[in-house]
């Protein structure tokens, strides 16, 4: 996994940073996959989504499909990897700020 991580998960980050991230990953708690969900928030609340245009972990077309289905405000960041929050922090922050500003209106 550590050899694939920089290429697949963090392709638009500097190699040393991607390697550090590969070494510092922790396992996800299994209960996140089995916890019951009674209501999907996107059915009653506005949502925002970022399509990472060069994501190799989640296909960008699938990301776009999910966001369209949820009627999300969609931002596409061409060339961004799955680590978009680190490689494009200003653009991600702008989406978060837009959501914070408009979510309650």
Residue spans for each PLM region:
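Alpha/beta-hydrolase-fold serine-hydrolase catalytic core, especially in secreted/extracellular enzymes
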Residues: 105
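Alpha-helical elements of Rossmann-like donor-binding domains used by nucleotide-donor carbohydrate transfer enzymes
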Residues: 4, 20, 62-65, 91, ...
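Short glycine/proline-enriched coil/turn segments at helix->beta-strand junctions
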Residues: 26, 44-45, 70-73
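Conserved loop-alpha-helix segment in the C-terminal half of the alpha/beta-hydrolase fold
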Residues: 53-80, 86, 98
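Short secondary-structure boundary/capping segments
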Residues: 38-41, 64-66
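Short beta-strand/loop motif that positions the catalytic acidic residue
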Residues: 43, 48-51
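Helix-rich cap/lid subdomain of alpha/beta-hydrolase
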Residues: 1-39
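Post-His helix in hydrolase/transferase enzymes
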Residues: 86-102
């Amino acid at each position: 996994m550590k050899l694939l991580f920089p290429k697949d998960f963090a392709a638009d980050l500097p190699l040393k940073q991607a390697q550090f991230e590969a070494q510092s990953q922790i396992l996800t708690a299994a209960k996140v996959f089995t916890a019951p969900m009674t209501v999907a928030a996107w059915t009653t609340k506005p949502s925002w989504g970022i399509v990472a245009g060069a994501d190799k972990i989640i296909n960008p077309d699938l990301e776009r499909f999910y966001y369209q289905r949820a009627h999300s405000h969609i931002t596409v960041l061409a060339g961004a990897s799955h680590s978009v929050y680190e490689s494009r922090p200003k653009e991600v922050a702008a989406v978060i700020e837009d959501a914070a500003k408009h979510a309650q209106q």
